[in-house]
Every structure is written in C-alpha cells, then in structure tokens.
Design a protein with these regions (language model features):
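Non-catalytic, topology-defining segments of multipass membrane proteins
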Residues: 1-125, 170-254, 290-339
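A short pocket-lining beta-strand/turn micro-motif at the edge of beta-sheets
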Residues: 149, 157-159, 274, 286
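Membrane-cytosol interface motif
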Residues: 2-7, 139-152
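Non-catalytic interaction/regulatory modules that flank or connect domains
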Residues: 240, 253-254, 260, 264-270, ...
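Short, surface-exposed glycine/acidic/tryptophan-bearing loops
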Residues: 36, 267-286
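Histidine-centered catalytic micro-motifs
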Residues: 18-34, 127-141, 152-171
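Short helix/strand-capping connector loops at secondary-structure junctions
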Residues: 164-171, 278-289
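Interhelical loop and helix-boundary elements at the membrane-water interface
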Residues: 73-82, 133-146
Length: 339
C-alpha cells in the first residue's frame, strides 16, 4: 500500500514525499511567520502560487525535523527517482490508460495528464491560500487557518483547515459525518480492509473544549458591544439608613432589590404593571415582591434594571443591629402598626 501511494503521489507532481513533508512540517511549526514557507500573511497570491515563483533562500525557511523520512527506504527511493517517476506516473501512465483502454491517446494526454495536473495543483494550492483566508476558526483564531465547506469542496476535503492545524496528528480534516472529506473516507476504508492501521484521532473532549472556548470568546466580544450598566463591584456602598433617608428627604426614586439600589425615576411611567407599584416600593426592600411575592419578573426586566444601578447596601439590606434606634422599625407604617 505504501508503495502504491508513493507512485500515485509522484503522479500528482507536487514534489517528493521528503520535499513535500519538509515544507508542510515547516508550515505547521512556523505558521504565519516569516519562516512559514507559504505564509498567508504575505498575501493570497504568495500563499497560493507566489512561494514557488519567487524562490526564497532555504535559510529563510524554518527548520523542520525529517529524520524519520531520511531513515525510510521507500521515501528515499522515491526522492532519488522522483524525476523519472513524475514522467512515468504523471504523464505516461494516465495517457496509456486512455490510449490502451479506449484508443484516445490525445485525450489521455490532454485531459488525464495535463488538465488533471492543473486541477490537482490549484486544488492543493488552495489549501495554502483559500483555507487561510475564507471561513472561521471554530477551534482557535490566533492563526490564519480557517474552516469552510467551499474550500473543502475545492480541495477534495482539505477545507476544514482550522481543525487540521489545531489537531495535526488527527487523520481527519472534517470530524462530522456530513462534512465533505473524501480523504478521510478513503483512509477509513483502507483501515477497515486492513490496508492502514494506527489511525490517530484527537480526544473528543479536547476537541469540544476548543470549540466551547471559541464560542465563549465570541460571546464576550459581542457582550462588549452592549450596555450592561455599572458593575456591582464598582458601585458605591451605602447603609440602609442612608438609602431610606435619600428617598424620604431627598425625593430619590430608589428601590432596593437583592442588596442593590436602583434609580427608577425615569422608568416609573413606563412600568408595564403601572406606576403605583414602583411608588409603593420606593425606600423599601422589594426583593421578595420582585421575585414572586407580587410578580416574578423576567430576565428582560433584570437586564433593564442593570442600567439603573446606583449603589449597593452595606450588609445587603436592613440589619436590626445597625439601626440608630432598634426599637423603631424603619420599614414603613405597616411594620410600625404591626409592632
């Protein structure tokens, strides 16, 4: 199987196993840097084709370890005989298949050899260019690799490139059954029939962890575009007595909910339940009433309240021991009458 793949790989005329793997490993190790042999940061044209047209000195390309390839006899054989193999497998073989098969030597040369190579080459080049430009980074966005089904279609399954860069040892590009990745299907089929083994996959827990972290990051980015009011930790602290005094003597339209003081002056006329319910709560602790005692308010109501924060109450609310005159209730006439 390895020998067949070495021959077919030579037929793609994209470099020997050793040469191609060396560049690919350098690309992964030095992604988006000056040492990346086809860095996307040098432009779409450069990453697609320019890196071959404008040859850079080898010392400018980042180092990549290929000792395992140097010790592989099949890889060394293919590398040594590469020029002969590309002529045999890239031109002679496809032309002969069409010529001997149905007598179309000219069509075999033009379509099966030349036109095929043009298509295969640009499909491969799109992995270095389009896959670093189009789509999103569902696993990480620190570097340019992206996932997109259009790129997957154009590259025969190599379009889920963000996953590939995050989990390079995984034999898959696409992890969902509905995602287009014929290379994965071929490898899995070979493994099923015993032609491939030791297929590596990254733990599902870690894959999902990366996805969740990116979802959280994007949610936080969206949250920064919204108004959330003054954070509770940044609010001034006041005593319950001062809160009540401000409402009674300074005509403040404040209510207390769960230890936080809210200014409802501008909202009173807009209150869906009517203005009178807010008026009766001014200067009081309305936590129980807000949370179902009078009406169980919605999440939207709580979000709206976040824009009305004024202060937090020391100790969270009225504390008997903190009253200036503990024998006199400060909760209102109803409490006084009850006393």
């Amino acid at each position: 199987m390895s020998f067949i793949l070495a021959l077919l790989g030579a037929g793609a005329v994209e470099g020997s196993i050793k040469w191609w793997s060396r560049g690919h490993r350098a690309h992964h190790r030095w992604t988006d840097t000056e040492k990346d042999p086809y860095s996307a940061h040098r432009g779409l044209f450069f990453s697609h084709l320019g890196w071959m047209l404008f040859k850079r000195p080898s010392w400018k390309i980042g180092h990549a370890d290929v000792d395992d390839l140097n010790n592989n006899k099949l890889v060394q054989w293919q590398h040594k005989n590469y020029l002969a193999l590309i002529f045999l497998m890239g031109v002679v073989f496809p032309t002969a298949v069409a010529g001997l098969g149905w007598g179309d030597w000219r069509g075999g040369y033009f379509y099966a050899a030349i036109l095929r190579l043009v298509f295969v080459h640009h499909a491969t080049f799109c992995v270095n260019s389009l896959a670093h430009w189009l789509g999103e980074g569902p696993f990480d966005d620190r570097h340019s690799p992206r996932d997109h089904f259009i790129t997957a279609f154009m590259t025969l399954g190599e379009g889920y490139h963000n996953f590939h860069h995050q989990f390079p040892q995984d034999y898959r590009n696409a992890i969902r059954f509905y995602q287009y990745d014929p290379t994965k299907w071929v490898i899995a089929t070979c493994a099923f029939f015993g032609f491939a083994s030791h297929l590596k996959t990254f733990p599902e827990n870690e894959v999902r962890k990366g996805q969740l972290q990116m979802i959280e990051k994007r949610v936080l980015e969206k949250k920064t575009k919204l108004q959330w009011g003054t954070p509770i930790a940044d609010l001034p602290v006041m005593s319950f007595e001062d809160y009540r005094h401000a409402c009674k003597n300074d005509n403040k339209k404040w209510i207390l909910l769960e230890g936080v003081v809210y200014d409802v002056a501008e909202f009173m006329s807009e209150h869906p339940g009517g203005e009178k319910y807010l008026k009766m709560g001014i200067g009081k602790d309305m936590t129980a009433a807000f949370n179902g005692g009078m009406y169980d308010h919605s999440n939207a109501a709580r979000n709206l309240l976040s824009l009305m924060r004024v202060a937090v109450i020391e100790f969270g609310g009225e504390v008997e021991a903190q009253k200036k005159n503990p024998s006199v209730p400060v909760y209102g006439d109803d409490h006084a009458n009850a006393a």
